[in-house]
Design a protein with these regions (language model features):
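Bilobed "Venus flytrap"/periplasmic-binding protein-like clamshell domains
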Residues: 23-49, 53-55, 111-175, 179, ...
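Pocket-lining segment of extracytoplasmic ligand-binding domains
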Residues: 80-82, 89-93, 121, 158-165, ...
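Sec/Tat signal peptide C-region and signal peptidase I cleavage site
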Residues: 16-22
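Ligand-binding clefts/hinges and TM-proximal coupling segments of bilobed small-molecule sensing domains
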Residues: 131-150, 225-287, 294-295
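Bacterial N-terminal signal peptides that target proteins for export
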Residues: 1-8
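Acidic, polar ligand-binding/catalytic clefts
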Residues: 75-109, 192
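An extracytoplasmic/periplasmic, membrane-proximal ligand-sensing/linker region
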Residues: 179-180, 189-206, 211, 218-220, ...
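Cleavable N-terminal signal peptides
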Residues: 9-10, 20
Length: 319
């Protein structure tokens, strides 16, 4: 005996609601142990718990915008200057053409990056690393080479002044530093990989950056939009025992224009309204200023779903 159509629909209804019905999306990050990967894990957790969307991590070596533009991932994490270069086909992406599908979701927390040395090293300043061994190449993460060049430029140095040890990405660079193959480690402050390196080599020390007008001009020429911030000692940051200045630029979340508006809206809302939950998983999110999430990135359009939420929240950028 067949059930009436209405009864069948009522029985099926529970199967179409709740967590099981949530749309699953992926967030592309850099490899496990990196600052971006840790931030992405916190974001995926909050989006999954605080919205109608289920988010999972997709850690890989390539830049997060690439699978987003290709449509193989819904969200990707990057930084402000690299996203601009990618979308406009400039910088490391010269000759690759304009990307027409990548859109901005949010400007998040600052990447605070620095050179690290072993705690017992006689290296005290960035100028002191001239002639030392440092990771380079970064074929899988070309933007890392540019950031490294920016830090070197702050002291009037370049890769030509260094002994370059080739590494495909920052994770390999951290392994080489721990193994004693390099003298200097570039990484974001507070990253899991830095903590692991510190535990292995007996501690690390962060090299301060100078913010003289000349240094700022040299850095801006290499890394547009970068800035200098003061970092104070914190249990979450290895290698900082007194207030110092470091290089910074913004972490951003991007998506594809074809990702449904409601999905991006839900993700944006969850991130904006749950700073405490984000910080509970990854302490760097204590630096998040939710109402600055709508900060524009040069030459990159907002996704309509993100813009809709920002308009409702009263923080949309002025056109």
């Amino acid at each position: 005996m067949k059930l009436p159509a209405l009864a069948a629909a009522l029985l099926a209804a529970p199967l179409l609601t709740g967590p099981a019905a949530a749309q699953t999306v992926s967030i592309v990050t850099t490899p496990a142990g990196s600052y971006t990967n840790s931030a992405g894990a916190a974001m995926a957790k909050v989006i999954s718990e605080k919205s109608k969307v289920r988010a999972i991590l997709q850690a890989q070596a390539q830049q997060g915008m690439i699978p987003v533009e290709a449509g193989t991932a819904e969200f990707g994490m990057s930084n402000s200057f690299d996203l601009t270069f990618y979308v406009t086909g400039t910088g490391e992406y010269e000759g690759q053409g304009v990307k027409k599908k990548t859109r901005l979701v949010a400007s998040l927390i600052p990447y605070r990056v620095a050179f690290h040395v072993r705690a017992d090293s006689d290296i005290k300043t960035i100028a002191d690393i001239k002639g030392k061994r440092i990771a380079g190449g970064f074929n899988a993460q070309k933007t890392i080479a540019r950031i490294t060049e920016t830090l070197l430029a702050s002291a009037g140095l370049s890769y030509k002044d260094m002994v370059e040890v080739l590494a495909p990405n920052v994770s390999r660079a951290a392994e080489d530093f721990t193994a004693g193959k390099t003298d200097v480690l570039f990484f974001a402050l507070g990253s899991a990989a830095v903590k692991q390196a510190a535990a292995t080599v007996g501690g690390v020390r962060v090299l301060p950056i100078t913010d003289s007008p000349e240094a700022l001009k040299r850095m801006e020429a290499v890394l547009p939009g970068s800035y200098v911030v003061e970092v104070r000692p914190s249990p979450q940051i290895d290698g900082v025992s007194a207030p110092i200045k470091t290089l910074a630029f913004d972490m951003v979340l991007c998506t594809n224009i074809d990702v449904p508006e409601h999905v991006v809206y839900e993700a944006t809302k969850a991130l904006h309204q749950n700073k405490a939950a984000l910080a509970a998983t990854f302490g760097a999110f204590n630096l998040l200023v939710p109402d600055r999430m709508a900060k524009p990135v040069k030459d990159v359009e907002f996704h309509p779903g993100a813009l809709k939420y920002y308009q409702e929240a009263g923080i949309a950028p002025k056109s």
